[in-house]
Structures are given as C-alpha cells and as structure tokens.
Amino acid sequence: MNNALGLVETKGLVGAIEAADAMVKSANVQLVGYEKIGSGLITVMVRGDVGAVKAAVDAGSAAASAVGEVKSCHVIPRPHSDVEAILPKSA
C-alpha cells in the first residue's frame, strides 16, 4: 500500500515534466498524475513509501527549479481517506 503523497507545483509545463521525470527516476514512487490549477500552475503527484516520496519530491523540486519556477512542494504521510477521495486514481 502506498502510504504517502508527494506534490510538486510548478509554473509551466516544462518544469512539471522535468519534476515528474526526476521524481520517478530518483526513488521507488508511482506517478499518480497531474492537475492543471490555472494561470499556468501545474501540480504533479506521486505515491509511495514516506522516505521514497520525500526523496522524490526533493529531486523533483530541484530539477524543476533548474528549468523553471517551483511554487510549492509538500509530502503528506498517510493521507486521510477523505483526502484520498479527491485524488486522481493511480493505474
């Protein structure tokens, strides 16, 4: 069971793609998907063990910062089931 959720929010698509690539390459996490927030903001989400998700978010944030602007990043260990209901379903 994946027990953590990692989020990296960027300004622009290039930063989001770079973050997603770095996250899945740097740790044993699964890419859940992305959400277009508006005004060019895109949030990329990954799931996995807490340690792996923390490492992935750090790597994704650093990679996205190199090519664009990171607005926010966060790790939620063990999200509540009510939060799970609003997340995209992983494959």
Curated annotation (Swiss-Prot):
Pathway: Polyol metabolism; 1,2-propanediol degradation. It comes from the Bacteria. Homohexamer with a central pore. Interacts with PduP, which targets PduP to the BMC. Interacts with shell protein PduA. The gene is pduJ. The keyword Transferase does not apply. It holds the Pfam family BMC. GO terms for biological process: propanediol catabolic process. This is Bacterial microcompartment shell protein PduJ. PANTHER family: BACTERIAL MICROCOMPARTMENT SHELL PROTEIN PDUJ (PTHR33941:SF11), PROPANEDIOL UTILIZATION PROTEIN PDUA (PTHR33941). It is found in: Bacterial microcompartment. SMART domains: BMC. The keyword Iron-sulfur does not apply. Signal peptide: none annotated. Belongs to the bacterial microcompartments protein family. One of the major shell proteins of the bacterial microcompartment (BMC) dedicated to 1,2-propanediol (1,2-PD) degradation. At least one of PduA or PduJ is required for BMC assembly; it must be encoded as the first gene in the pdu operon. Required for structural integrity of BMCs and to mitigate propionaldehyde toxicity, probably joins facets responsible for BMC closure. Probably the hub for binding multiple enzymes to the interior of the BMC.
